[in-house]
């Protein structure tokens, strides 16, 4: 694979509307060349015998079964609350906005 040129980097910078100095053109050309070589190397991997997967680990169901269990009654849940009304926790108002009914 041919190395990316300074002119190509300058063109990409113009398209991206990036201000790039002459020194940065050389640096970016080298860095982009390394990245493109790595991408090309990944593309060379033969994966025809590997089945497509959605996960790298072959687990099918790692969640527990849903089980109905007993829970607190409204009275038990509200028993430690400083204030309650209509089976709900009552808290101080924090906004001074009028509530439209």
Curated annotation (Swiss-Prot):
GO terms for molecular function: asparaginyl-tRNA synthase (glutamine-hydrolyzing) activity; ATP binding; glutaminyl-tRNA synthase (glutamine-hydrolyzing) activity. Signal peptide: none annotated. It catalyses: L-glutamyl-tRNA(Gln) + L-glutamine + ATP + H2O = L-glutaminyl-tRNA(Gln) + L-glutamate + ADP + phosphate + H(+); L-aspartyl-tRNA(Asn) + L-glutamine + ATP + H2O = L-asparaginyl-tRNA(Asn) + L-glutamate + ADP + phosphate + 2 H(+). InterPro entries: Asp/Glu-ADT_sf_sub_c, GatC. Its EC number is 6.3.5.-. Allows the formation of correctly charged Asn-tRNA(Asn) or Gln-tRNA(Gln) through the transamidation of misacylated Asp-tRNA(Asn) or Glu-tRNA(Gln) in organisms which lack either or both of asparaginyl-tRNA or glutaminyl-tRNA synthetases. The reaction takes place in the presence of glutamine and ATP through an activated phospho-Asp-tRNA(Asn) or phospho-Glu-tRNA(Gln). This is Aspartyl/glutamyl-tRNA(Asn/Gln) amidotransferase subunit C. The gene is gatC.
């Amino acid at each position: 694979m041919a190395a990316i040129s300074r002119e190509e980097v300058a063109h990409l910078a113009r398209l991206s509307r990036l201000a790039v100095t002459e020194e940065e053109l050389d640096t970016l050309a080298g860095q982009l060349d390394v990245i493109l070589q790595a991408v090309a190397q990944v593309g060379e991997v033969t994966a025809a015998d590997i089945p497509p997967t959605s996960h790298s680990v072959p687990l099918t169901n790692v969640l527990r079964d849903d089980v109905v269990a007993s829970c607190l009654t409204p009275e038990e849940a509200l028993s430690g609350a400083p204030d309650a009304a209509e089976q709900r926790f009552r808290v101080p108002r924090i906004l001074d906005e009028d509530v439209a009914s």
